[in-house]
Amino acid sequence: MNIPKPADSTWTDDQWNAIVSTGQDILVAAAAGSGKTAVLVERMIRKITAEENPIDVDRLLVVTFTNASAAEMKHRIAEALEKELVQRPGSLHIRRQLSLLNRASISTLHSFCLQVLKKYYYLIDLDPGFRIADQTEGELIGDEVLDELFEDEYAKGEKAFFELVDRYTTDRHDLDLQFLVKQVYEYSRSHPNPEAWLESFVHLYDVSEKSAIEELPFYQYVKEDIAMVLNGAKEKLLRALELTKAPGGPAPRADNFLDDLAQIDELIQHQDDFSELYKRVPAVSFKRAKAVKGDEFDPALLDEATDLRNGAKKLLEKLKTDYFTRSPEQHLKSLAEMKPVIETLVQLVISYGKRFEAAKQEKSIIDFSDLEHYCLAILTAENDKGEREPSEAARFYQEQFHEVLVDEYQDTNLVQESILQLVTSGPEETGNLFMVGDVKQSIYRFRLAEPLLFLSKYKRFTESGEGTGRKIDLNKNFRSRADILDSTNFLFKQLMGGKIGEVDYDEQAELKLGAAYPDNDETETELLLIDNAEDTDASEEAEELETVQFEAKAIAKEIRKLISSPFKVYDGKKKTHRNIQYRDIVILLRSMPWAPQIMEELRAQGIPVYANLTSGYFEAVEVAVALSVLKVIDNPYQDIPLASVLRSPIVGADENELSLIRLENKKAPYYEAMKDYLAAGDRSDELYQKLNTFYGHLQKWRAFSKNHSVSELIWEVYRDTKYMDYVGGMPGGKQRQANLRVLYDRARQYESTAFRGLFRFLRFIERMQERGDDLGTARALSEQEDVVRLMTIHSSKGLEFPVVFVAGLGRNFNMMDLNKSYLLDKELGFGTKYIHPQLRISYPTLPLIAMKKKMRRELLSEELRVLYVALTRAKEKLFLIGSCKDHQKQLAKWQASASQTDWLLPEFDRYQARTYLDFIGPALARHRDLGDLAGVPAHADISGHPARFAVQMIHSYDLLDDDLEERMEEKSERLEAIRRGEPVPGSFAFDEKAREQLSWTYPHQEVTQIRTKQSVSEIKRKREYEDEYSGRAPVKPADGSILYRRPAFMMKKGLTAAEKGTAMHTVMQHIPLSHVPSIEEAEQTVHRLYEKELLTEEQKDAIDIEEIVQFFHTEIGGQLIGAKWKDREIPFSLALPAKEIYPDAHEADEPLLVQGIIDCLYETEDGLYLLDYKSDRIEGKFQHGFEGAAPILKKRYETQIQLYTKAVEQIAKTKVKGCALYFFDGGHILTL
């Protein structure tokens, strides 16, 4: 039913239709800023206040995504009802609605489920006194249940269980398998029928050698991937072929490219036949490239064409590696062999689920997942045929609710959808379900939201609604200026499609201008691209600073410009411009690890900033000390917590005093040593007094803890130690006190759980830390203050800001999950590697590969939607900030797609994206503003789009100019003071005598620096030949005052070259040497080292995988792999006379102990060889390349290699046949 829109209505036609349409299920696709909440509220108000047949507000079920949204909606409805009451003061119906509003069903779906459980608990034998468990409490119960289950399974001793254990555990423990069981269980809970879903994915492995791979349920995704890769290879070769036709192009190579294309086309013709591809893909051979010589050929075009052809080769090699290293029969056999293992896993998960549920019922608790599943159980009943159908309870709600309205429908999951279908009445064409959402803003896949539910209805429903539901598009944006909308549309028309993005960004999806802003020429979207290449000749400070600091400096610079200009923002309520304030600005990040550094930089530049950090609480010193006190109370025989407490302000012992305690008893636990000190100590001794007071408190607290709650104990500790008062007097005291109060509050919350006691509380906290569930530092600053906001993109959803900075666009997407040995998918189930514990081999099965490809598309689609949410938060000005290693290379990479005539960029190019810049860059390369900069003409229809961009290419060292100017200004002030005869500022005025004393040096200093035990690296540094390329210089006295310089902790940031070298060495130490590793295998090695905490995240990101793999393709790499004996990281100690190392030493015959670690030794038929890896920068550092570098590098490292050789020959009694240095940069080998 449609009601005509009044002539004076301010609603758009689409909004009006969304407000008044009835009679069927309605899906409203509401774009960002389109006023969907206002439409939703207006629809409810009109139903409640209609003059004919009004309904009561409690006959509406309104489902929101958050409690805050529900509260806001109730508030808006109350305001509207109160206004209506002013117009109709005698209306009893309106007064009734105001009284009913508080108990109206306007809430999250979890809250509605809770209502259902409280009303119908008896239908499922649920204890009516149940409570909702804390997440950590639930996990602790689950851990206990899992431990008991595994103990029982081990006791049974069944072969099937041990087969499972052998495949998914390490030699040391079975925690990996326990984690797998819990993960599969929790994932299954996103399905309406978890057990049925678990049992269904066994069918993936229910095959025989006669099965057709093409008919298996996962093959659709294998087929799509093969087609995409082949088309991607073809696209590269077509681009290369086009280059041969260009002026100066490599025309002789045309025949090569045509032959290559013919082979690719042959594969494309058979891309649906896996068996045929198994025969054909390995047989593809790219012929030797024809020579291109002569001045008429452009070397740049030749290089570009060569790179494109090499790229196509790599794609085919990857295709072969992924799918065709094993025959179809071998693939099927692997699946069949894994089937019994998967069946055992499924039964183990089901057993765990039943035990876990029983344990929770015993304690009368439920979790959020139980809320939905118990509600679903209440709303369904089994009929005579054994089928599930709506129960009496469901029919009650169907009659109760006149309409069910769902906000943020794109974030609904399968269980929630099932519940909604059970409380609504009728099929889609006559239903009463009203859904509002925007699939382009579905960014909660990690919470198992299912955007395909929205998409399937959007494709099925029609604008007329005939025979099905009705869809209504709200695409007018009332939030942002035209420049913001144009920029967003320009990017997403090229990036978002059905395969990657999961929605076509067509005319219906485009944002249309709905807001009326006065003209402003300064609102174009700005891209700040920061080049922090390490091989630049910039200062060491520029090389040392991390990417985050450069971006923070760039942001701070732009904020200062906005505030000082000042930039004008439009106040819509007052209909006038005003000066921008800090509170008008937000900085958005994908995640918060960068937040502390950005806040530090902004504050250093005088910019107030606020972030609601969700981490850092447990690292706060005052919290760590308080937890150490509790650990000591629980068990004083814990040395580290006890030392922490003694060193803290609570006791106040210094390092020397801690040593005195340890000397009292060197072998006993530290607690015993402390008691011995007290027993033997001098009662007038200050340390004795400190320890005696603490010991008395400790005994009191231990006794107190036995009869009081943990929260009472914490408060007793605060009171006895006055620690709360102490931290209040420290810098940031208000924040520190708030942190201590949070710990007390957390203890009180813990006491409402099923657990009791101090030991359990400490385990409770440890569990939170293991899970990464940091409490976040307590809020001590109001969000209403005039400060710049810093938040995640997810936190910003639903908010708007006049000026938005989207930072960290060069950070890699988190694809870690794709590297696991197993994956879970709602549609396909469980994909795993084939694992043979006896043969110690494993490799991906086809279901695992299919899921990996499918999930990569889904992850990229999610990242596109996250980017869309970020861009659409801006009202007036948008800044995009990202960093790269070399912007010229980056531009060249982006230009590859510039000549495309279709709006949507090629699927394969988008599939390769690893960062937001990989999305944004190629799209911007086709815009006139960046296209001119890149030097590549784009298609006129695309480059002529009205979007306006301002692109800045910034070198990292340019961002340090402000600091340099500040230092120069300070120096000028000192010189001016001297000229005027005035005192030099105090921090630089030195008494001559003090200067003389501080500058005194010991006359025989060189003798003191020769230690009896030295490392090879120390000896090398002292004897090494210094050169202009080494990047080092001999130590010399500082000229002028050392206080003129910044302290080291402010200078040094990020990984040094040595630290990066160490990371590369770590990989070379652990990478398998049985065969030439692939890129993927090397990446897996790096990932494994990171998981084992042998590499930090920063080191992992610094490793150049291609440089690692390149080594194994060299002659020396081949020798190493084929060697009959090899060993790595070999430590040695060797005593040598000092004169052999330092010819001028005073004590020439004094023995020195030389220690070192040899990177690699290997033995071939010829003899023993010594190999050392080097991470020196070679390319671009020497005028004549490696030829010029060789003698310098040989001189630099000859001492080190001589000592290594001497050590091997003396210790192993074997002559070293040869020595070599391998330089990762450029893949150069230097024999010595």
Curated annotation (Swiss-Prot):
Q: What's the impact of mutating K36A? A: Loss of helicase and nuclease activity. DNA-binding is unaltered. Dramatically decreases ATPase activity, kcat for ATP hydrolysis is 4.64 min(-1), loss of helicase activity
Q: Which Pfam families match?
A: PDDEXK_1, UvrD-helicase, UvrD_C
Q: What is its EC number?
A: 3.1.-.-, 5.6.2.4
Keyword Coiled coil assigned to the entry: answer is: no
**Residues that hold ATP according to the record:** Q15, G35, K36, T37, R76, F478, R479, E541, K573, R873
UniProt keywords, alphabetically: ATP-binding, DNA damage, DNA repair, DNA-binding, Exonuclease, Helicase, Hydrolase, Isomerase, Nuclease, Nucleotide-binding
Q: What subunit structure does UniProt give?
A: Heterodimer of AddA and AddB.
- Similarity remark: Belongs to the helicase family. AddA subfamily.
The protein's name: ATP-dependent helicase/nuclease subunit A
